[in-house]
């Protein structure tokens, strides 16, 4: 600017921004940006990096930096009932800068990292279930759990970081993946997007294993969703030695039929001793105990050996690691109570599959793909998941483990408006089936509370040795 060019800073910046960004017809500067604009422009001799979002021709300027190489960051967060996982990414390259996971309480990146980059976070995408979405926004979630199970909202846009007190640029956009029903939330719309079942001609099934087991069935023509209360067992909750899939978690188990000795796969570096057992390990150990006839179809111990013990009440348990073998100096075992809890969790999943398919006059023979998601370990032994009656007894090549699809979907939304639009489209077009009001669901659930099922004809390949 000069005495002959007295255009105000805001207008000068707006004109240059419109010229620099293709498709930009209007520029809006946030209050946070205007407050520091004069000093930043002059410190940088009017050579600045403009950061913001361009939507429908409107550029919302969130920051003006004198550093030409200042990074653009985004956050993707999966808020589960049991676990919260988040990643910090470079929006320009997609490179992950940091990752953190914790029990659902408070999640933090390292203090030094967040202090350096907080003002450069311009988009935050969150995928969580319906209840967690309500709690995050401070909205009453009680109606979600009471008949007729009506949430306050399915979708809510227009929020910024300052609205939620989120550690980011105060004008950073907060995007919630939209909910579908009372118990099918944004974690599933984001997950269904990741699975790509919406882009296939064949029928596929998507299953997210968590405290709420959530399912989506369909193809490019239609999709149906439902949810069942599986409890936290898949994530190690309600299991005496259960834990999340972090260092020290037993994630795979093989048991010798004759000696009853276990071979354990443990999360962590070589030599890592076991601390507890995560979801994938629980599936394995129950399947192996059943395969080797150590437990009955009711989950009760029927064989004796040095790895099988009983408490003063006669309650049996299988010892995966003695106190001397564990990292903590405490015995790691799975009890009959643990097994019963997990049988109920797997029964909820299988009965939900049956009810959803039968509501469409279909059965598992129509499935061309079964995608399984959830943060329960580095993978699932599908053979064992079928053996215990959690997944249908179909060709194992049809199964694929996708990991944390809720987080993957949130990551895609953070980097692409096209992904945001597609997730919104999936949510608006998906039919929601309320299992809690289905009169057949409880009968199906009770029938599935055995290993593998009361109807053995459904699981011809599940045999005991």
Question: What residue ranges belong to the model's regions?
Answer:
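Phosphate-binding loop and its immediate beta->loop->alpha context
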Residues: 1, 12-15, 104-120, 278
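Nucleotide/phosphate-binding catalytic cleft detector across ATP-hydrolyzing
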Residues: 1-76, 81, 93, 119-123, ...
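Glycine-rich phosphate-binding loop of actin/hexokinase-like ATP-binding domains
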Residues: 80-81, 86-88, 94-112, 143-158, ...
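Phosphate/ATP-binding catalytic cores across multiple sugar-kinase/actin-like superfamilies
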Residues: 119, 188-191, 195, 343-365
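Short glycine/threonine-rich loop-to-helix capping motif typified by GTGT followed
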Residues: 129-143, 314, 362-365, 374-393, ...
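Glycine-rich phosphate-binding/hydrolytic loop that grips phosphoryl groups
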Residues: 166-167, 178-194, 343-347, 399-436
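Catalytic phosphate/nucleotide-handling subdomain of diverse soluble enzymes
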Residues: 219-224, 238-239, 358, 362-426
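Gly/charged contiguous loops adjacent to phosphate- or pyrophosphate-bearing nucleotide/cofactor binding elements
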Residues: 283-345
């Amino acid at each position: 600017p000069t005495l002959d060019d007295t255009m105000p800073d805001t207008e000068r910046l707006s004109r240059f921004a419109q010229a620099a960004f293709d498709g930009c017809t209007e520029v809006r500067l946030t209050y946070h940006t205007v407050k520091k604009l004069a000093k930043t422009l002059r410190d940088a001799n009017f050579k600045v990096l403009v950061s913001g979002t361009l939507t429908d021709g409107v550029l919302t300027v969130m920051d003006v930096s004198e550093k030409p190489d200042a990074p653009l960051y985004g956050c993707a967060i999966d808020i589960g009932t049991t676990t919260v996982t988040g990643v910090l990414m470079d929006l320009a390259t997609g490179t992950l800068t940091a990752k953190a996971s914790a029990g659902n309480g408070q999640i933090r990146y390292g203090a030094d990292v967040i202090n350096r980059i907080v003002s450069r976070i311009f988009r935050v995408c969150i995928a969580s279930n319906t209840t967690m979405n309500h709690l995050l926004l401070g909205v009453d979630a009680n109606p979600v759990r009471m008949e007729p199970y009506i949430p306050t909202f399915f979708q809510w846009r227009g929020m910024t970081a300052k609205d939620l007190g989120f550690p980011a640029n105060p004008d950073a956009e907060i995007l919630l993946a939209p909910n579908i029903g009372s118990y099918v939330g944004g974690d599933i719309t984001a997950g269904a997007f990741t699975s790509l079942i919406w882009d296939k001609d064949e029928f596929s099934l998507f299953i997210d294993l968590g405290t709420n087991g959530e399912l989506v069935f369909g193809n490019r023509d239609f999709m149906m969703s439902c949810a069942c209360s599986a409890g936290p067992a898949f994530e190690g909750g309600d299991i005496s030695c259960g834990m999340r899939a972090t260092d020290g978690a037993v994630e795979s188990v093989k048991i010798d039929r004759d000696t009853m000795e276990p071979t354990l796969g443990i999360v962590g570096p070589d030599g890592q001793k076991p601390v507890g057992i995560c979801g994938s390990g629980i599936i394995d150990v129950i399947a192996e105990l059943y395969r080797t006839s150590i437990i009955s179809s009711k989950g009760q111990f029927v064989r004796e050996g040095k790895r099988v013990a009983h408490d003063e009440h006669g309650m049996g348990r299988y010892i995966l690691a003695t106190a001397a073998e564990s990292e903590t100096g405490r015995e790691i075992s799975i009890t009959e109570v643990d097994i019963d809890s997990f049988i109920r969790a797997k029964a909820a999943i299988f009965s939900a599959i049956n009810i959803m398919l039968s509501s469409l006059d279909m059965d598992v023979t129509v499935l061309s793909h079964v995608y399984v998601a959830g943060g329960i370990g580095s993978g699932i032994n599908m053979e064992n998941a079928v053996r215990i009656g959690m997944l249908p007894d179909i060709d194992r090549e049809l199964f694929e483990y996708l990991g944390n699809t809720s987080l993957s979907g949130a990551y895609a939304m953070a980097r692409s408006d096209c992904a945001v639009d597609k997730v919104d489209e999936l949510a608006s077009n998906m039919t929601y089936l309320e299992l809690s009001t289905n009169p057949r669901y409880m009968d199906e659930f009770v029938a599935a509370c055995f290993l593998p099922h009361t109807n053995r004809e459904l699981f011809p390949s599940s045999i005991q040795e």
